[in-house]
C-alpha cells in the first residue's frame, strides 16, 4: 500500500513538472537560487521537484532509494544534464543522505542504485548526522557484503574515514568479529 502511495505521489509531482515546463519554455527567465547558482526557469522547476522535502525531510532521491526503485532514479537521471550534489547530499531529518539509505537496504539492486546516485553527484564518503557513519560503515553494520566490496573498489572511496566514535569501517568489522567483511578490507589494502 505504501509503495502505491509513493508511486502516486511521484506521478503527481511529475505531472506538475510537465505542466510547468510548458510555461517555462515559453518564458525563459534567469534568476539566482538560494545556493547562488543561476538557473533557467525550467531548470528551477525541476530543481524544486527534486529537492522538495516530504514529512521526514527526504527528497525525491530519498524516497526513490527507500522504495528501492532504480526506475525512479533513472527517470531523474534522464532529466538532469549535470551532477547535482547539493540535492543528492541533502540529509533527511534523521541525518541520512540517499547513499546511507541505499547502504541500509540489503537488496540486489543496491549496487546499481549507488552507482546512479554517485554519477549524479552524491558523496561516497558522506557521513550521516547522528553517528557519523559513511555508507561503508553502514554496510559493515548491516552485513551488506556485496555493496561493501563494490564500494571498496569505487573511485574516491576513503576506507579510513572515522565515525563520531573514532572507528573506521574496518574497526567496526573487527569489533563485530565479521571475518568476511574483514577479508574484503584486507583484500582492498593489498591492492593499494
Swiss-Prot record:
Domain of life: Viruses
GO biological process, one term: symbiont-mediated suppression of host NF-kappaB cascade
Gene3D superfamilies given in the database record: Ankyrin repeat-containing domain
PROSITE patterns, per the entry: ANK_REP_REGION
Pfam family, one: Ank_5
Record InterPro entries: Ankyrin_rpt (IPR002110), Ankyrin_rpt-contain_sf (IPR036770), NF-kappa-B_inhibitor (IPR051070)
Mapped ANK repeat ranges: 94-126, 131-161, 165-192
Keywords, in A-Z order: ANK repeat, Host-virus interaction, Inhibition of host NF-kappa-B by virus, Repeat
Function in brief: Suppresses the host immune response through NF-kappa-B inactivation. Possesses ankyrin repeat domains required for NF-kappa-B binding but lacks the regulatory regions required for dissociation from NF-kappa-B and degradation. Therefore, prevents host NF-kappa-B release and subsequent activation.
Family affiliation: Belongs to the polydnaviridae I-Kappa-B-like protein family.
Protein name from the UniProt record: I-Kappa-B like protein H1
Species for this entry: Microplitis demolitor bracovirus (isolate Webb) (MdBV)
Amino acid at each position: 500500500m505504501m509503495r502505491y502511495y509513493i508511486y502516486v505521489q511521484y506521478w503527481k509531482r511529475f505531472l506538475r513538472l510537465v505542466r510547468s515546463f510548458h510555461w517555462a519554455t515559453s518564458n525563459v527567465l534567469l534568476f539566482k537560487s538560494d545556493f547562488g547558482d543561476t538557473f533557467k526557469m525550467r531548470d528551477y522547476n525541476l530543481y524544486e521537484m527534486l529537492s522538495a522535502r516530504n514529512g521526514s525531510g527526504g527528497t525525491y532521491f530519498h524516497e526513490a532509494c527507500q522504495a528501492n526503485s532504480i526506475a525512479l532514479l533513472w527517470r531523474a537521471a534522464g532529466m538532469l544534464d549535470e551532477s547535482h550534489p547539493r540535492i543528492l547530499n541533502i540529509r533527511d531529518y534523521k541525518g541520512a543522505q540517499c547513499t546511507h539509505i541505499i547502504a541500509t537496504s540489503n537488496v540486489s539492486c543496491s549496487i546499481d542504485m549507488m552507482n546512479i546516485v554517485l554519477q549524479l553527484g552524491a558523496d561516497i564518503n558522506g557521513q550521516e548526522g547522528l553517528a557519523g557513519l559513511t555508507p561503508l560503515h553502514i554496510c559493515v553494520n548491516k552485513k551488506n557484503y556485496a555493496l561493501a566490496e563494490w564500494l571498496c573498489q569505487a573511485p574516491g572511496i576513503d576506507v579510513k574515514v572515522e565515525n563520531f566514535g573514532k572507528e573506521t569501517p574496518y574497526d567496526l568489522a573487527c569489533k563485530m568479529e565479521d571475518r568476511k567483511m574483514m577479508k574484503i578490507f584486507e583484500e582492498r589494502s593489498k591492492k593499494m
